[in-house]
């Protein structure tokens, strides 16, 4: 029966959990992103294991008999195992020009957290991308008045943005939440209390998305992504949709956020010239092998640019992710299998990869 390497993080309705820590009656996600209970677990040591690499940067280590639902190139869907795919090779054609095995990309997931968020998700997204906090104000750098006005309406109290001279920097003078009729500005302590310490912004290279936002409701996560994309997202002529910033952790957090919304994406690095030095930037490329990317923007100029491209290139959406490499490890590895309360016997593993549980029946051929 198939199993996954211990230590692999499994997304659950309350956050990620190492697979070996999951218990009967705990919940994971099925392939549609809905919570589903665990009926059984088992752990054992396997003499060999296999690491599968996917084209969008995801990877996972499994036992040799781990079962997969695969769409084979130029063929229908089949059921196969990690060992079978390794033995036959993942590339096909005379010159090995294409990848033979593809898995269906995950759907958006539904976390169970109902905790109130201290800052509106859209505003937080803009702040993480283009904002900073001072002693008595929040500043956002943007050439798009649309973004500034939207943030103004979503602040704890709608307040008028002020521009720093002839620059593109706009600041909001946040007033104390305890004296609504007072003109006294909040102190730095109160500002940190309002935004919560982990959200106060300092260096852009150190920004990250707080955990409560990554496991918030579908609507909140989408609003957060929209704030980040309206501020630091780009749509290129070739149809690429990119999020760019200088924080590695923010890039990884954004990648997790996007994948939880049902998008396929991967991270690239780029050294951006800055006077005499080169600043390392992180680019998250959101591929067309995923959901409707137009939902990620509300800023009209970016949204219309993407809609214009999608309208001219009405290529059928391909929500499948190719397996590009499989590596075998000939050493003992502890693995854990799950039995899921689902008719399809599927759940989402690390990075929301759809995978079969240990009870799925295996047979070669079409299903």
PLM-predicted stretches and their roles:
Residues 1-23:
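Protein maturation boundaries and topogenic segments
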Residues 280-313:
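Polar, glycine-rich mid-to-C-terminal structural blocks
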Residues 7, 79-80, 276, 286, ...:
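Intrinsically disordered/low-complexity terminal segments and short unstructured peptides
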Residues 8-13, 28, 50-53, 284:
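A short beta-strand micro-motif
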Residues 315-317:
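Extended catalytic core of nucleotide-activated donor transferases of GT-like folds
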Residues 1, 24-34, 39-276, 319-367:
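Intein-associated homing endonuclease modules of the LAGLIDADG/DOD-type, together
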